[in-house]
Amino acid sequence: MKIAIEAQRIFRKEKHGMDYVALETIREIQKIDRQNEYFILVSPGEDRCLQESDNMHIVQIDYPSYPLWEQIGLPSTLKKIQPDLLHCTGNTAPLWCHTPLILTLHDIIFLEPKQGKNQSVYQKLGRCYRRFVVPRILNKCRKIITVSNFEREHICKFLHWEPKKITTCLLYTSPSPRDPTTSR
């Protein structure tokens, strides 16, 4: 099976929680699955924290912004690769994509009433983008994964969904990069 994994931001130097979830998930898949063929779809970045292997290929997609990368670059690349499945790891996905989709929905804070006013323009635009995209892709997903039972219950309650539509997968178990008592 050919599986594409969207991991747009894993090569950026300053990673966020979702980036670590994607990175560690991919590293674990790389250790245990030698049968399927994987295409890790990334943006260019300084931190080459993942290496290719026999069945795992890194595909760099170069677009100037997150929305253009996801809505134009990613679907264009998928047409070339022709994967059997796409896993989008960071809450959003292409609006027009014919590849069967699995989505990791970490939280839905962007759908809730905004708290505070100290957001940068970048954060405000990102929030608007997610508020537009996420409701439009959820029904297209073959499976939705979230990272805790608490968030699963919250998503189901907020969106009035049946719990069976969402799977909890405790993905990230690596030591915190800020924790001096642990080592890799």
Predicted regions, residues:
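Carbohydrate transferase catalytic cores enriched for Leloir-type hexosyltransferases
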Residues: 1-174
